[in-house]
Amino acid sequence: MTTQLDALRNMTVVVADTGDIDAIKKYQPQDATTNPSLILSASSLPQYAPLIDEAIAYAKAKSADKTQQLIDAEDKLAVNIGLEILKIVPGRISTEVDARLSYDTQATVEKARKLIALYNEAGISNDRILIKIASTWQGIRAAEILEKEGINCNLTLLFSKAQARACAEAGVYLISPFVGRILDWYKANSDKKEYAPAEDPGVISVTKIYNYYKQYGYNTVVMGASFRNVGEITELAGCDRLTIAPALLKELQENSTALVRKLAFKGEVKAKPQPLTESQFYWQHNSDPMAVEKLADGIRKFAIDQEKLEKMLLEKF
């Protein structure tokens, strides 16, 4: 009996959206993605206690300055969790830059280089790592610099076509357009509270981005993210990659209903348009109130969880 998860693997690279090692072992994804919220959640698991202790010891040995120690411990913990995950997945781990740097190109570049250096010191090559960066104009510019240095990036919190287009034009390795958070916004801001999967505004957004990339021959990988239900996932079967939380991986594994491929580009590849300028990017992105609100909200939420993680680490120093 073929499960929907097995069927999905035949048309899409399945990625686990979690820092939980036990869940990753169970569902055997190709890659895994983490973010500050997932790192915070994983840090409460007992098996991660030694990783926290090691990160703090590393930070204390590296600097006598308390502020710097905290920064170093955060970075080392994120990498330590990534290293554990890389023992299980055959592909890549996505590790996220501090969301509070989302509007600072140079600081984002420097943080990414530091995270990569920590992985390299542990014997992990660049081709097993993706640096996650919020899809702000400044974040996209940082990714453009990093890609030229051989550091592949995963541009996250992506809600608008302008963000997707700017990422492709910058030569970004991979984007994570969000599905569920778009649905959340439309439910909260319209009278319609229920959507069939094919009418889900998040599904429609990712489908349009996928088709746009294929239509113009962009190599940037499209990895749908942030799912609220299995219907959103099955409606995007055929997308380059999908990053899925363990609870939804479980549902897919327990369902044997036939899965039909929904995304597959057929047609001629067109000449690429001129890249967006900064002013064009902001005009187009800001024309979409959902994208503006959800990008800002996502950055805020990740920053809050980063601060909670810092508080937890400080208590252990």
UniProtKB/Swiss-Prot annotation:
Catalytic activity: D-sedoheptulose 7-phosphate + D-glyceraldehyde 3-phosphate = D-erythrose 4-phosphate + beta-D-fructose 6-phosphate
Listed EC numbers: 2.2.1.2
UniProt GO BP: carbohydrate metabolic process; pentose-phosphate shunt
Top-level taxon of the source organism: Bacteria
A GO CC annotation given for this chain: cytosol
Pfam families on file: TAL_FSA
Paired cysteines (S-S): none
Subcellular localization: Cytoplasm
PROSITE patterns xref list: TRANSALDOLASE_1, TRANSALDOLASE_2
UniProt-listed InterPro entries: Aldolase_TIM, TAL/FSA, Transaldolase_1, Transaldolase_AS
Pathway: Carbohydrate degradation; pentose phosphate pathway; D-glyceraldehyde 3-phosphate and beta-D-fructose 6-phosphate from D-ribose 5-phosphate and D-xylulose 5-phosphate (non-oxidative stage): step 2/3
Keyword DNA repair listed: no
Catalytic class of the enzyme: transferase
Family recorded in the similarity comment: Belongs to the transaldolase family. Type 1 subfamily.
Subunit architecture: Homodimer.
Function of the molecule: Transaldolase is important for the balance of metabolites in the pentose-phosphate pathway.
Protein name: Transaldolase
Organism: Histophilus somni (strain 2336)
Upper taxonomic lineage: Bacteria, Pseudomonadati, Pseudomonadota, Gammaproteobacteria, Pasteurellales
